[in-house]
């Protein structure tokens, strides 16, 4: 369910704003989106897994807060990230 190290490193390379960037909002949102997509698929198969459901809701809330921060501080980066990830905000 969690993103593998290899996949996480691929995401970091793809969304990093500079060399060694692992903490920018874009990277964090991209990794959370991958996690959310994996958990969503898990929940489709295991609908009674309430512990994973709570974790999914927490990750969605964290991503929402990061996106809100980016929207308030840099609208162009926000719009570019939403387009790259294909989110419906």
Swiss-Prot record:
InterPro entries: Ribosomal_uS15 (IPR000589), Ribosomal_uS15_bac-type (IPR005290), uS15_NS1_RNA-bd_sf (IPR009068). The keyword Transferase does not apply. Pfam families: Ribosomal_S15. It comes from the Bacteria. GO terms for biological process: translation. SMART domains: Ribosomal_S15. Disulfide bonds: none annotated. One of its GO terms (molecular function) is rRNA binding. The keyword Transmembrane helix does not apply. Part of the 30S ribosomal subunit. Forms a bridge to the 50S subunit in the 70S ribosome, contacting the 23S rRNA. PANTHER family: RIBOSOMAL PROTEIN S15, BACTERIAL AND ORGANELLAR, SMALL RIBOSOMAL SUBUNIT PROTEIN US15M. Belongs to the universal ribosomal protein uS15 family. One of the primary rRNA binding proteins, it binds directly to 16S rRNA where it helps nucleate assembly of the platform of the 30S subunit by binding and bridging several RNA helices of the 16S rRNA. Forms an intersubunit bridge (bridge B4) with the 23S rRNA of the 50S subunit in the ribosome. This is Small ribosomal subunit protein uS15. The lineage of its organism: Bacteria, Bacillati, Bacillota, Bacilli, Lactobacillales. The gene is rpsO.
């Amino acid at each position: 369910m969690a993103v593998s190290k290899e996949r996480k490193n691929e995401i970091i390379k793809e969304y990093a704003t500079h060399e060694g960037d692992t903490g920018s909002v874009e990277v964090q949102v991209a990794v959370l989106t991958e996690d959310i997509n994996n958990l969503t698929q898990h929940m489709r198969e295991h609908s009674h897994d309430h512990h994973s459901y709570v974790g999914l809701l927490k990750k969605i809330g964290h991503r929402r807060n990061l996106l809100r921060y980016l929207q308030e501080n840099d609208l162009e980066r926000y719009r570019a990230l939403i387009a790259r990830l294909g989110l419906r905000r």
